[in-house]
Amino acid sequence: MASEDCKQALKLLARSRNVLVSGAPGTGKSKLLAEVALAFETAFGLAPAGGPPQLNPMGGIPIPPAAGAVKDIPAPTKMDRKVFRTVFHQNSKYRDFLSGITPAVNKVAAGPDFTIVKGTLYRASEHAKGANGAALLIIDEINRGPAVQVFGGAIVAIESDKRLASDGAKLAETQFFEMLDPVSGDVIEYALPHDL
């Protein structure tokens, strides 16, 4: 059974899609985020992570903890739910969060070689863009890293009213930003999905 703080955090995420948890060290922020992550992945037991419900003749019937709980979670109709986590620190980089070029150190080649990295926000966004996908991005210690540098153009695009529509369509308010496409290597315009 989820705690009241967890339910409140999920309700806020369903409404605004962004929640900032703050407090003094040792007050239970990490524990709350772990509980929120589990509740998000399982949708309070209504939508098991990893696919549609499976018949289990020995299992119980999943019942929401309270009336209306289904709508009080982010992306209640999405079944492919995944949590992505990252921790910000002094050396956090844009390339680790969105995309960028890094040296390929394990390749045997005549000269230097580079690879394009898919960052945490990019991977979460691509998962949420899937037909049945929803992603929860947990950024721990956001105040310890250079957040503006790490987010880059996504700092505005992460606002809930600046994202794509729930069907992936562009809206008048959708905020696009340029980034290096990890697949093609080209600079592309990118927007964040509704179910992130």
List each model region and its residues.
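AAA+ P-loop NTPase catalytic core and its hallmark functional loops
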Residues: M1-L196
